[in-house]
Amino acid sequence: AWGSNLDWGFNKHPPMSAFFTEVFFKIFGSNDWAYYLLSQIFVLIAFYYVFKLANLILGNIKLSLISVLLLESIYFYNFTSPEFNVNICQLPFWSLVVYYSWKIYKSKEIEFIDCFLAGVFAAIGFLSKYLFIYLLISIGLLFIYLIFIKKIKKFDFKYLITLEVFIVLLVPHIIWLYNNEFVTIEYGLKRTGIEETNLIDHIKHPIIFLIKQIGVLIPFFFLIWI
């Protein structure tokens, strides 16, 4: 419903999940099956680029397929995947950003298109869910470590293409946030319980979260073991 009033941001989430659902609404109307299909399309795109990434790294189609099957065993790629939401929306862009980042890292001659696409998909991923920034920070720190500390790679100004594209695509959303008193960020911070004064809760809830994450990864660990 909120996708019908497209904007550069919303009270709870950045705009991309609303944008994609609105596109499907314009094509298929309010048929439930269309949104289940949309969700599975996003999951399949994620699997496809995980397969391509694994094949780049391993050079073996069989092992690359096994990589996808292992990913499929993770709770967030199976049981929760029928419902299209911000978590599903970001999945293909995780795979795409990692895939193009790997291509940039391994290429002897860095291609403009790889840097450009990495920036585009990074922006779309971030505009799907803010927590996408964790992946971007991790990749950025890794490149900084490899280039400036380990000196395995030489700095190339083409790296900045990715950053420039990312920032340019975020500008409309940043303007929207400013004009709306950063309501989306405020909502996210409230959900973290940052105002909670009970110190025990700040210890208890992370432990509970960790236990749950270990639980949902049990099938994945089991398949690796066998």
Q: What residues fall within each predicted segment?
A:
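Hydrophobic alpha-helical transmembrane segments
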Residues: 19, 37, 64-69, 115-116, ...
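Transmembrane-helix motifs of polytopic, lipid-linked glycan transferases
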Residues: 37-58, 95-100
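Short acidic/glycine- and proline-prone juxtamembrane loop motifs at membrane-interface regions
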Residues: 79-90
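Transmembrane-lumen/periplasm boundary regions of multi-pass, lipid-linked membrane glycan transferases
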Residues: 124, 135-226
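Extracytoplasmic catalytic/substrate-binding loops of multi-pass membrane glycan-assembly enzymes
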Residues: 1, 8-21, 29-34, 181
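Membrane-interface transmembrane helices that cradle and orient dolichyl/undecaprenyl
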Residues: 55-58, 97-117, 226
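Membrane-interface alpha helices of multi-pass inner-membrane proteins
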Residues: 5, 114-130, 141, 166-170
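Short helix- or helix-capping micro-motifs
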Residues: 67-72, 122, 126
